[in-house]
Amino acid sequence: MPVFIVFLLCMFTYTCFAEDSSESGVTEQAQAVFSELLSSLEEETKEALSEIGIDDADYTQLLSLSPKRVVDAILELITGKMSEKLKAVGFVCALLVLSAVLDGFAQPGSTMHSVFSVFTTLLIVVSLLLPVSESLVQAFSAMELSSNFLLAYIPAFAGVISMSGKPLSSAAYSSAMIGLSNLLAQCNVKVFLPVVQVFFSLNIASSVQPKYAFNSLVAFFKKAVTVLLGFSATIFTGLLAIKGSLASAGDSVAVRGVKMLVGSAVPVVGSALSDAYTSVLGSITLIQSAVGIFGIVVFALMHVPVILDLLLWYLALSFTASVSEALGQKQAATLLNGIASTVSLVNTLVIFTAFILIISTGIMLNFKN
């Protein structure tokens, strides 16, 4: 009787096969991470991503990113922002030529000569204050947007790093970047913005009232800020590289230990399980690289348009300052050089922020088990 029951069970059994769902599981995890990151972006950044061919939460689009589309988008951006600067240059040059002609009818050092110089300087301030201020506001908005995006990006990227078998590297990255995010958010409002306002005011005051020569003070101030930012960037990236290197070494030892333990402790199928573990880690490492590259692209799209806009303003203001000096308009030249110096300082702040965010992500992508 027991033999007959066993025979019946064998007759009515079905053959089953294990489903290889590793690839689909990795794809679903990647889609979930990208969807979360995309939902935290502003509409302008999403449109910029769409212009370069990244319009869906699919890491395969990052692999097919076309350099030609990126270059075309940058050229289109420069062309669109060029018209405003050319109009400003034309208007300021016309004022300078008119002021130079009127100065020809006034005696050097006379009251009329001083009136013409002050009047020209004030007209330049009025004509440039609004467009330049809008560009400066956009620069601070870009830095604020990048700080807000970090709040969603840090947990996602750190989580993927931890899933890929590098929990120590994940902890090192998240601790450093959370501190950086809070520091940038506080500095944008309490340090950077007041510094730029004071810097801008001193430049205008030194041009309207030549007896208050703040040029040397402003130049020293700018140089000090630039050196401080460069020193801070070097220290931060160096510390992150050191912490990441040590954490990566510890993670590598842990992964090898797990593989050795599984291969030796589990009989018969130990080596197969060890290979499967390695395959899973490799798949998750692919997600880590995709998320890291996506973050670098987003940070670049947030900052590159602002950097190019400020660079165009700097070139336009420097050109008009050269024209002003050639026409003998010293006060106007001082004003234009001062505004150009302010724009250059803000651009330095934006480049510093972009450099820190992009390089820190690149450092973590460089460490492999």
Question: Which role fits each region the language model picked out?
Answer:
Residues P2-I5, L9-L95, A100-S117, L130-S141, ...:
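Gly/Ser-rich, low-complexity
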Residues V89, C93-V97, L123, S127, ...:
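Residue-level signal for the membrane-embedded core of alpha-helical transmembrane segments
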Residues L98, L102, S201, A205, ...:
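Alpha-helical membrane-inserting segments
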Residues V115-V126, S146-I154, L183-V189, F220-T234, ...:
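Small-residue-enriched core segments of transmembrane alpha-helices in multipass membrane transport
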Residues L122-P131, L150-P167, C187-V195, I204:
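Mid-bilayer segments of alpha-helical transmembrane spans in multi-pass integral membrane proteins
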Residues A176-G238:
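Loop-centered beta-sheet repeat module
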Residues S289-K330:
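Helical hairpin unit composed of two closely spaced alpha helices linked by a short loop
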Residues L327-N347:
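Interfacial loop-to-transmembrane junctions
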